[in-house]
Amino acid sequence: MKHARRFSFGLIVLLPFVAGLSGCVTPLGRGYRFDQREIEILPVLSDPPHLHVLVSDRITNIGNQPLDSLVAEMPAGPTFGMQNLRVTVEGEDAEPHLIPAPAVRLYRIPFDPAWTMSEASQQHSVVFEYDLAPQPGGRGTISVSADDYHLGDPTAFPVWQTPAGVFSKGGRAPLQMTLHVEALPGQLLAALGEEIVPGKNSSTGERVFKIATDDPTPYVVAGRYVEQVVSASGHTVAFWTFAPLDAATAQTAAHRLGASFETFDHFFGSAPPGTNTIRIVETKAALPAEFGVAGEPGGSSFPGGVILDARTIAGGLASESGMQLEEYELARTWFGWMVRPRPEAQILMGRGVGLFGVALAAEARGGAKERQQVVMEFLSRYEEARTKAADRPLIEPATGYTREQRVSSGYKAALFFVALEDAAGNERLRRAMRHLVRATSGSDVGDDELRSAVEEETGRDFGEFFRTWLNHPGIPAEFLKRYSEDGSAVPTASR
């Protein structure tokens, strides 16, 4: 039965330490050291427009036996139309073998000849080359046009899988990483990392960024934008739009965004490096709405920033619906970028946490009454969505879900976190979420890690709570009773 397996949250912290100790002695299993990664992203304005991606890795065999292959997770799902994949090993073409797996695309990369143990100090070259193109039905994390382009998705680049085995070594983060991107003439550009080759003096438009090992996945946004910078709520907010914003609109939006970002920083943990400036970026691509009516404008995210459909800008950047969309995407800086939800937890830990962030920001802004209003709004939207598609279990890959199923399950996931906050208490859940981000940053997480963190902070068993919410359809009657139509709510734990 789900959740029968339990472990201490402290084990999440101890396991990397124990694994590190084994590096001091003779290796006991297969393994590799991920020495270096260099990523190049080039916009190609062909028909159809796409991004050409070149990923060059350097890897060393540090295990106790030869390595004849490694497995890499590649971009998959409706967001990407990955085409023209080519892999070379030591400069020679290698035929990647697709491994059947639910919700992810795994390839086994063969090494011929195998990397022997005698080459323990020798770095080996593996190069991936492929094209990414926006696809209908995707989340809008990639776009390419003559005026702008962006790539903001944690799953856009190969992810090496540690070999199977108790004593195996590996990891997804390289010791060194650089990002090469191109800004077309007249474009503003933002990317992850510290710029080491300034692009203003470059005749080619190439920009090079050095990425720290504890940074999230690389991203890039670029376009021929008008920049408006506003300081509000202790933060700097930069608006990159194709036409100037009304000054009052920009000021109103910046004030709320700065306050909301501060709330997330307090509740989820310190924001990643490079997010001192919050960026709100317009794109000419039609981004699909994850919630609301099909065909409405949506958004996307990158660490410390939001990408908005031009229709959202035109419809009111500082409107309530626009601000909630921006807060939802900003919250995904933590759960989506810093912490990557596992495939079966994408709706719970991705959409659910993002919408829960909207409720957190509302309470910080207007107290319990404002939070109550947002929760009632979520509940109403959930009930409306259920008339079109019943919600699914919150822990399973969303592969094959209809849009309506994603919407109803997404709102239920948000209400789960509201109920969890009521049950655990605001301060204890805050500590649990901060510990979760700190201990698992850069890793895949799911409901097991969340439950362990909450139980560690509260000293209580949340097994039945998780089973009721995650495995069964509908909203528990106890929650509906507390959040009745008259607007009253009776928390079960001190806030």
Predicted ranges, named:
Residues D68-A94, P174-G186:
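Solvent-exposed beta-hairpin/edge-strand motifs
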Residues I59-G63:
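Asparagine-centered strand-capping/turn motif at beta-strand->loop junctions
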Residues G23-H52, S484-A489:
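N-terminal, polar/Ser/Thr-rich
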Residues P27-G29, P78-T116, G137, P288-E296:
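Solvent-exposed beta-strand/loop surfaces of large extracellular or lumenal domains
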Residues V55-D57, V226-Q346, G357:
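Juxtacatalytic substrate-recognition/specificity segment
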Residues G298-G299, S321, A345-A423, T440, ...:
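Acidic/His/Gly-enriched intrinsically disordered linker/tail segments
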Residues L28-R30, V53-R58, Q83-E90, D131-G137, ...:
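Beta/coil-rich, acidic/histidine-enriched accessory regions frequently appended to metallopeptidases
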Residues P100-A101, I109-W115, S125-Y225:
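Extended, low-hydrophobicity, Ser/Thr/Pro/Gly-biased non-transmembrane segments
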